[in-house]
């Protein structure tokens, strides 16, 4: 899949799950299951409930995503 096929949305982390998975509530009210991207994992950036994040969604599965940015 090409990178320009992704949908970028903002949301808030509501819950942390095992294996670096998070429940994220998007701005439109939907809840998705998101994992951490490799760059965030590599730089040891902590993501906690309540953090505002940017999530990339695949057009093929809108219930799962990848967290690509955590706002300060």
Curated annotation (Swiss-Prot):
Biological role stated in the UniProt entry: One of the essential components for the initiation of protein synthesis. Stabilizes the binding of IF-2 and IF-3 on the 30S subunit to which N-formylmethionyl-tRNA(fMet) subsequently binds. Helps modulate mRNA selection, yielding the 30S pre-initiation complex (PIC). Upon addition of the 50S ribosomal subunit IF-1, IF-2 and IF-3 are released leaving the mature 70S translation initiation complex.
Annotated HAMAP family: IF_1 (MF_00075)
Keywords for the protein's UniProt record, in alphabetical order: Cytoplasm, Initiation factor, Phosphoprotein, Protein biosynthesis, RNA-binding, rRNA-binding
Family assignment from sequence similarity: Belongs to the IF-1 family.
Organism: Oceanobacillus iheyensis (strain DSM 14371 / CIP 107618 / JCM 11309 / KCTC 3954 / HTE831)
Record InterPro entries: NA-bd_OB-fold, RNA-binding_domain_S1_IF1, S1_domain, TIF_IF1
Subcellular location as annotated: Cytoplasm
Residues bearing PTM Phosphotyrosine: 60
Complex formation: Component of the 30S ribosomal translation pre-initiation complex which assembles on the 30S ribosome in the order IF-2 and IF-3, IF-1 and N-formylmethionyl-tRNA(fMet); mRNA recruitment can occur at any time during PIC assembly.
Stored PANTHER family: TRANSLATION INITIATION FACTOR IF-1, CHLOROPLASTIC
Domain S1-like: 1-72
Signal peptide (from-to): none
Recorded GO MF terms: ribosome binding; rRNA binding; translation initiation factor activity
One cellular component (GO) term of this entry: cytosol
Protein's UniProt name: Translation initiation factor IF-1
SUPFAM superfamilies recorded: Nucleic acid-binding proteins
Family matches, as PROSITE patterns: S1_IF1_TYPE
Pfam families per the UniProt record, alphabetical: eIF-1a
């Amino acid at each position: 899949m090409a990178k320009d096929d992704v949908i970028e949305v903002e949301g808030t982390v509501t819950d942390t799950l095992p294996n670096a998975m998070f429940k994220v509530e998007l701005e439109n009210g939907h809840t998705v299951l998101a994992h951490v991207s490799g760059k965030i994992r590599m730089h040891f950036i902590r993501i906690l409930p309540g953090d505002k994040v940017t999530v990339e969604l695949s057009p093929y599965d809108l219930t799962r995503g990848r967290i690509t940015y955590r706002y300060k």
